[in-house]
Amino acid sequence: MSASVAVVSGFLRIPSIQKSQNPSFLFSRPKKSLVRPISASSSELPENVRNFWKWLRDQGVVSGKSVAEPAVVPEGLGLVARRDIGRNEVVLEIPKRLWINPETVTASKIGPLCGGLKPWVSVALFLIREKYEEESSWRVYLDMLPQSTDSTVFWSEEELAELKGTQLLSTTLGVKEYVENEFLKLEQEILLPNKDLFSSRITLDDFIWAFGILKSRAFSRLRGQNLVLIPLADLINHNPAIKTEDYAYEIKGAGLFSRDLLFSLKSPVYVKAGEQVYIQYDLNKSNAELALDYGFVESNPKRNSYTLTIEIPESDPFFGDKLDIAESNKMGETGYFDIVDGQTLPAGMLQYLRLVALGGPDAFLLESIFNNTIWGHLELPVSRTNEELICRVVRDACKSALSGFDTTIEEDEKLLDKGKLEPRLEMALKIRIGEKRVLQQIDQIFKDRELELDILEYYQERRLKDLGLVGEQGDIIFWETK
């Protein structure tokens, strides 16, 4: 699902994003604007949105007392307060019968075919089938869904070319390849043998559309629900000014004597009547992940990150010993480390680098006698040779990655400052700038470390001090027998 570039010593790779890609909230492209929202009560609202609001009213989900309603906003569609909304006040509640999740698929006509499918694949297939069914009970909701988002999975080849050199590009291509492989499997196992159940020929483009919808709009991390579309709730947009994602939504019982479940969405902040209601999608996602999942990026430098992949080569003569040590410290054959703009190196990264680089005279630390202490020893420099190697490998990896870009940070910033850019080009520029800044930061960290190699204290010196064999000036103490 990802591509990587091997560099230098063979134990460090510059990969695509390796974090889990769980579907979470929904698509939006936040922009600050003073444009007046067009609300659901207005005749200016698109007909499909008015029909959607009426459908929700007919379902008993909304009424004249509802505190928020759909509206045309700078991001596209959003939820706007009909009256003042207090902090942590419930904005909407959607009953389970209006959710779309794997259970919905199981109860549908195609349910018997989907038992062996991945949950997201089965829901994607359900969405596509219902989209082509004119009499679908979900018709009004499906008519509300966009044909695409600004997620990089929908970008053209020309647009993707603007991401040349970035990890986001390799991740996007890897994700698209993964989705295509899942579609080909689905086509052979389900679609072709069961043409009678599908009124229209389902294509790869349909499948990518459904994937993008789920990636951008589905809620996850809920009680018993890891993949669920919630009509109306999925109009809520993201605001970077909101710094908490706690308690914005939950699944709860409908009442004391009811077995029904409700999806409850709360406003994390006070909202005035007529203003848009926002939440925080995910505080931990990088800009590359935001671009892939939702189709937007933030200006916050803490969203800029780069993933270094470090692996123990199978050709290493000490492969087994190193793997045992890594696994005993909750790591593995490959380590993924996210370096964030302006922040220190992640915990465990230097230790893992030193472990992977261990060899020659330093290999004695791999002996079983050190099993319980080696990770602690690796917190500090082992030897000049070991430390010099990891500095060289990381710096060469950064230079290799930077050479993959056609432009400098200054050139990208000049383009960005001109303004009036297409949203996707603007996003690509910000991603390029962010990744290059972090690469330069990593390179500088290890460049500074190279300058300290002569003054660092290494394992042997620390050991001699522990034994009382080194004086205050660093000279070795000898005793002569009398």
From Swiss-Prot:
CDD domains: SET_RBCMT. S-adenosyl-L-methionine binds at E75, G76, L77, R217, N237, H238. Its main location: plastid. Transmembrane segments: none annotated. The keyword RNA-binding does not apply. Substrate binds at R217, R221, D234, Y249, Y281, Y294. Residues 1-57 form a transit peptide. Pfam families: Rubis-subs-bind. This is [Fructose-bisphosphate aldolase]-lysine N-methyltransferase, chloroplastic. The lineage of its organism: Eukaryota, Viridiplantae, Streptophyta, Embryophyta, Tracheophyta. The gene is LSMT-L.
